[in-house]
Amino acid sequence: MSFNHHTIEELHELLVAKDISAVELTKATLEDIKAREEAVGSFITIACEAALKQAAALDAKGIDPDNVMSGIPLAVKDNISTKGILTTAASKMLYNYEPIFDATAVANAYDKDMIVIGKTNMDEFAMGGSTETSYFKKTKNAWDHSRVPGGSSGGSATAVASGQVRLSLGSDTGGSIRQPAAFNGVVGLKPTYGAVSRYGLIAFGSSLDQIGPFAPTVRENAQLLSVIAGSDRKDSTSAPVQIADYTIKIGQDIKGMKIALPKEYLGEGIDPKIKETVLAAAKHFEKLGAIIEEVSLPHSKYGVAVYYIIASSEASSNLQRFDGIRYGFRAADAKSLEDIYVKTRSQGFGDEVKRRIMLGTFSLSSGYYDAYFKKAGQVRTLIIQDFEKVFADYDLILGPTAPTAAFELDTLNHDPVAMYLADLLTIPVNLAGLPAISIPAGFADGLPVGLQLIGPKYSEEVIYQVAVAFEATTDYHKQQPMIFGGDR
């Protein structure tokens, strides 16, 4: 029996009433994963034994009637540390790495008696926008298996969209939660930088990375964020902000709220069908009583260039720790210490990772630092100031999540610049450290289209409030792909 059409609250009621046990729910989830895995390829590791052991222990202890997450399975992106469960970052470099500690986000989930069911596929070290750079496999879009799921958190998105799991965790450095959420018709949120601890997240761009939730609905997304968020002494970038319940404003009226629509987000490079969907959503918000006005974010056009200098520079530094000495892959034919370093990194990293390491090393090198990295930091400040000016007068910003719907497999993975430009609408949010959500807003040629709502720092509750207002008066989130029992 499958329970994947039940909401978290419905599952909780079944567990509390003992109509099902945690073991039965876990077994059913494992069956859902197995039944769909060949078609979509969401997982790198399925933690059957560990999950069933945890579920049995929970049944013996008893489900907490006051904890809606008690006994709920959770899929975790494979760059988030899980004690005793392989954490590979989808790289040959870490193909056999089994952490001895949990990431804080995972530990928080365990504290709420959630059950980690497996680790999801991703772009190698989270570097990519299509989940095609994984060392292990290519994940496929839940709606059309000839298309990409987005990236880098593609596996976490398809696991939810295809009905393998109800909830999952991803990470977002330049759009890696929101873009795959848009491509697969699910809800994905990138929290404010520092709202969720980065302890245990394998670092890509340390000033940009953020762990966040995927779910089929806005409420369930907010419920999962309430579990994983919070300040953490183990993370020096963790914000001293503690919000117990991110669902607190869900259901409140949005009448009179001012929402900005940047003209740059509907300009050159945006598919006309995506633009049409976003404008229709804007009109829908007006019917709900919100005030929609056009604004300008003039420096957002520089976001992609700024991002790939800063992110690659930070990556070149962060990835220096992978050298074949203490853990992970080591080249077998090395004859000296220098040989170990050179051959291990040459053989262990994929092409995209090596490309970004080289770009970052160049940007940080003597004679080029001022022209590239320092200049990128200055333009980043201008992007931040653009957002601050808008949020002085508006509650939220509205726009598309991605310039197109999901593209076909093997079409952009050999064109790095085209792949990078696919993130032009999500990258500015990371550069500014802001929260943003992608929610289902329609379809273009049968493929899901995501709507992005961006807020000032620590405004997640308001974002959820507005997102639910849209979700509750539309049915896009209810439409499911054929693999999940839908008719598309």
Swiss-Prot record:
Q: Which residues form a coiled coil?
A: none
EC code(s) of this entry: 6.3.5.7
Kindly state which reaction or reactions the protein catalyses. Answer: L-glutamyl-tRNA(Gln) + L-glutamine + ATP + H2O = L-glutaminyl-tRNA(Gln) + L-glutamate + ADP + phosphate + H(+)
Task: Identify its protein family.
Answer: Belongs to the amidase family. GatA subfamily.
Specify the enzyme's EC class, one word.
Answer: ligase
Q: Which UniProt keywords apply?
A: ATP-binding, Ligase, Nucleotide-binding, Protein biosynthesis
What GO CC annotations are associated with the protein? glutamyl-tRNA(Gln) amidotransferase complex
Q: Gene encoding this polypeptide?
A: gatA
Question: Quaternary state and partners of this protein?
Answer: Heterotrimer of A, B and C subunits.
Q: Which residues form the active site?
A: 77, 152, 176
Specify the species.
Streptococcus equi subsp. equi (strain 4047)
Q: Name one GO molecular function term.
A: ATP binding
Query: Its function?
Result: Allows the formation of correctly charged Gln-tRNA(Gln) through the transamidation of misacylated Glu-tRNA(Gln) in organisms which lack glutaminyl-tRNA synthetase. The reaction takes place in the presence of glutamine and ATP through an activated gamma-phospho-Glu-tRNA(Gln).
What is the designated name of this protein?
Glutamyl-tRNA(Gln) amidotransferase subunit A
GO process annotations (BP): translation
| Family matches, as InterPro entries | Amidase (IPR000120), Amidase_CS (IPR020556), Amidase_dom (IPR023631), AS_sf (IPR036928), GatA (IPR004412)
User: Gene3D superfamilies, alphabetically?
Assistant: Amidase signature (AS) domain
The record ties this protein, via PROSITE patterns, to: AMIDASES
